[in-house]
Amino acid sequence: MAAPAVSGLSRQVRYFSTSVVRPFAKLVRPPVQVYGIEGRYATALYSAASKQKKLEQVEKELLRVAQILKEPKVAASVLNPYVKHSVKVKSLSDIIAKERFSPLTTNLINLLAENGRLSNTQGVVSAFSTMMSVHRGEIPCTVTTASPLEETTLSELKTVLKSFLSQGQILKLEVKTDPSIMGGMIVRIGEKYVDMSAKTKIQKLSKAMREVI
């Protein structure tokens, strides 16, 4: 039963790799285009998973793949360019058997191994995650402050940020701390960037003072 899914994903990857339009390759376009090798693999996988209504399952499995490849022992045997291909294949087969990944995820791993692209796996996972984030209507937002925010302040900030979103969009907030900005905050939401840090204000003041003098 896995053969059609395997051959289908394989055809789609080759389709994007060669940019040749084929009548049988009716691809489901992802909500956002990710360029490069990783983008081509992720797009083909997104299309195949979407057709089978397994986007969430594949996303979960890919995150697990990324986690596994970060393990020192696995990385040493699978991502090391000096390790024989046969050894890598054996290691991957053992991992796939143990994790019981779906045919879609299994075939992606096998394709990456076959094409010598295992080093691009993390990039493919990242590209697929980006597609899924947009698919869910998530808007990435990063807030950087000099020190951790209090719960009340964070709650108020979330309310303000959500007011800028359109209906159906979901705020995906990440809060970071960076003492070097001295105070205030730096906000990046979607393609918008606002620097309200004390460091930048001081730099602007310093520049203005030098111009006056």
From Swiss-Prot:
Keyword Transport in record: yes
Question: For the modification N6-succinyllysine, which residues carry it?
Answer: 90, 158, 162, 199
Tell whether Protease is among the UniProt keywords: no
Q: Where in the cell is it found?
A: Mitochondrion; Mitochondrion inner membrane
Task: State the GO CC annotations.
Answer: mitochondrial inner membrane; proton-transporting ATP synthase complex
**Which UniProt key words apply to this protein?**
Acetylation, ATP synthesis, Hydrogen ion transport, Ion transport, Membrane, Mitochondrion, Mitochondrion inner membrane, Transit peptide, Transport, Ubl conjugation
PTM per Swiss-Prot/TrEMBL: Acetylation at Lys-162 decreases ATP production. Deacetylated by SIRT3.
In chain numbering, the transit peptide falls at: 1-23
Top-rank taxon, per record: Eukaryota
Supply the InterPro entries for this chain: ATP_synth_OSCP/delta_N_sf, ATPase_OSCP/d_CS, ATPase_OSCP/dsu
> Which residues are recorded with the post-translational modification N6-acetyllysine?
54, 60, 70, 73, 158, 162, 172, 176, 192
How does the record describe its quaternary structure? Component of the ATP synthase complex composed at least of ATP5F1A/subunit alpha, ATP5F1B/subunit beta, ATP5MC1/subunit c (homooctomer), MT-ATP6/subunit a, MT-ATP8/subunit 8, ATP5ME/subunit e, ATP5MF/subunit f, ATP5MG/subunit g, ATP5MK/subunit k, ATP5MJ/subunit j, ATP5F1C/subunit gamma, ATP5F1D/subunit delta, ATP5F1E/subunit epsilon, ATP5PF/subunit F6, ATP5PB/subunit b, ATP5PD/subunit d, ATP5PO/subunit OSCP.
The UniProt entry, under NCBIfam families, shows: ATP_synt_delta
Q: Which purpose does this protein serve, as stated in its record?
A: Subunit OSCP, of the mitochondrial membrane ATP synthase complex (F(1)F(0) ATP synthase or Complex V) that produces ATP from ADP in the presence of a proton gradient across the membrane which is generated by electron transport complexes of the respiratory chain. ATP synthase complex consist of a soluble F(1) head domain - the catalytic core - and a membrane F(1) domain - the membrane proton channel. These two domains are linked by a central stalk rotating inside the F(1) region and a stationary peripheral stalk.
Q: What is this protein's record name?
A: ATP synthase peripheral stalk subunit OSCP, mitochondrial
* Gene expressing this chain: ATP5PO
